[in-house]
A protein has these predicted regions:
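Secondary-structure edge/capping motif, primarily at the C-terminal ends of alpha-helices
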Residues: 1, 28-35, 61-62, 86, ...
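C-terminal effector-binding regulatory domain of bacterial HTH transcription factors
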Residues: 116-131
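Short, charged helix-capping/linker segments at alpha-helix termini
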Residues: 66-70
Length: 131
């Protein structure tokens, strides 16, 4: 995910995780649902490394687009959480196929990032405040 256009990076990252789920199902189950005796929280460690890398890439993109780089860690957590939780769901479902799931997850991530506001705020409840 180090090179290429931003959307392609997202797609490759999502496909990589789903391919791991598909090809190393037992390993993913161990990582996602527990750990081997005597070992630490392996899945958490892997996700933390992935999140750090994604956050670093997002900081670059945010700087390029004039967004707050300090928030890249939050968005990295959100993106990795979206992808990893969807992978857990797909582990049990396996329908739709991997490429369809990856396309939909990438669509959500890409279009959500593409339309980001520089100063987001909560709109829910504003009508109640005005009343």
């Amino acid at each position: 995910i180090q090179e290429g256009r931003w959307r392609e990076r997202i797609e490759r990252g999502v496909l990589a995780l789903l391919t791991y789920v598909e090809e190393e199902t037992d390993g993913f189950i161990i990582l996602a649902h527990g750990q081997l005796p005597g070992q630490g929280r392996t899945y958490s460690t892997i996700l933390n490394r992935v999140t750090a890398e994604v956050s670093h890439l997002l900081a670059e993109a945010f700087k390029h687009r004039g967004l707050d780089e300090a928030m890249a860690g939050l968005y990295g957590q959100a993106l990795v959480g979206t992808v990893s939780n969807s992978a857990l769901w797909w582990l049990d479902e396996r329908v739709p196929d991997k490429h369809t799931v990856a396309a939909h997850i990438s669509n959500l991530c890409w279009n959500g990032l593409r339309g980001m506001e520089a100063q987001p705020r909560i709109y829910a409840g504003e009508a109640e405040k005005e009343a």
